[in-house]
């Protein structure tokens, strides 16, 4: 099983590259997001590798970041999501963006990936919601992931307010997800969500 490749980038094609490792050319499938990060032809390249062994072929999938490789594997645990769909999702969303979309139940964001419809996106959120937060920064790893509706007005209002206060969208979304989890069972208003989110976003004193 190949876990990592380090070699010379020899060729770039639409959906894969060829990496020369000590005279052996390896075909490695990549996402669209990885392409702009590739070095020039003839230069050194290092990739995390996920190996798929099938009866008809052995396929290698390459990733610059370990988190991308981990999400690639997680996505394929969802019924209806194979390597092609998982790679399409990671070609559209970064690991942080994907974790944020799942945390906020943002079906539309996941559906931006080519070949990914609403039903598959809903299944991804349902199956992987407990996996999303550990991939984000500043996360309470023991906290269960809340299931948020992007159509929920207090949630949308709170997210907009936090962004207007100067926080990045991904930071605000993570804090908001944790705030909703902490307030589970209470009558939640946008003001209450904002207060709890600000506590999470405030630097420790």
Swiss-Prot record:
Identification of the protein by name: Holliday junction branch migration complex subunit RuvA
Molecular function via GO: ATP binding; four-way junction DNA binding; four-way junction helicase activity
Subunit: Homotetramer. Forms an RuvA(8)-RuvB(12)-Holliday junction (HJ) complex. HJ DNA is sandwiched between 2 RuvA tetramers; dsDNA enters through RuvA and exits via RuvB. An RuvB hexamer assembles on each DNA strand where it exits the tetramer. Each RuvB hexamer is contacted by two RuvA subunits (via domain III) on 2 adjacent RuvB subunits; this complex drives branch migration. In the full resolvosome a probable DNA-RuvA(4)-RuvB(12)-RuvC(2) complex forms which resolves the HJ.
CDD domains listed in its UniProt record: UBA_RuvA_C
Region annotated Domain II, chain positions: 65-143
Annotated function: The RuvA-RuvB-RuvC complex processes Holliday junction (HJ) DNA during genetic recombination and DNA repair, while the RuvA-RuvB complex plays an important role in the rescue of blocked DNA replication forks via replication fork reversal (RFR). RuvA specifically binds to HJ cruciform DNA, conferring on it an open structure. The RuvB hexamer acts as an ATP-dependent pump, pulling dsDNA into and through the RuvAB complex. HJ branch migration allows RuvC to scan DNA until it finds its consensus sequence, where it cleaves and resolves the cruciform DNA.
Organism (species): Bartonella henselae (strain ATCC 49882 / DSM 28221 / CCUG 30454 / Houston 1)
Region (Domain III): 150-205
GO CC annotation, single: Holliday junction helicase complex
Swiss-Prot/TrEMBL domain comment: Has three domains with a flexible linker between the domains II and III and assumes an 'L' shape. Domain III is highly mobile and contacts RuvB.
Transferase listed as a keyword: no
SUPFAM superfamilies (alphabetical): DNA helicase RuvA subunit, C-terminal domain, Nucleic acid-binding proteins, RuvA domain 2-like
Major subcellular site: cytoplasm
């Amino acid at each position: 099983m190949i876990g990592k490749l380090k070699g010379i980038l020899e060729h770039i094609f639409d959906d894969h590259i060829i990496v020369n490792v000590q005279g052996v050319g390896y075909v490695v499938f990549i996402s669209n997001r990885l392409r702009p990060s590739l070095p020039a032809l003839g230069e050194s390249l290092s990739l995390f590798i996920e190996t798929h062994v099938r009866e008809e072929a052995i396929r290698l999938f390459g990733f610059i970041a370990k988190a991308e490789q981990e999400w690639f594997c997680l996505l394929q645990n969802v019924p209806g999501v194979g390597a092609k769909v998982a790679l399409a999702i990671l070609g559209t969303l970064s690991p942080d963006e994907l974790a944020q979309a799942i945390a906020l139940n943002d079906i539309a964001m996941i559906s931006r990936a080519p070949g990914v419809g609403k039903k598959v996106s809903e299944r991804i959120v349902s199956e992987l919601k407990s996996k999303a937060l550990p991939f984000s920064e500043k996360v309470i790893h023991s906290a269960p992931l809340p299931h948020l509706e992007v159509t929920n007005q207090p949630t949308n209002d709170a997210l907009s307010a936090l962004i207007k206060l100067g926080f990045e969208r991904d930071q605000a979304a993570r804090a908001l997800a944790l705030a909703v989890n902490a307030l589970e069972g209470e009558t939640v208003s946008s003001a209450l969500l904002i207060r709890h989110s600000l506590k999470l976003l405030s630097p420790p004193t």
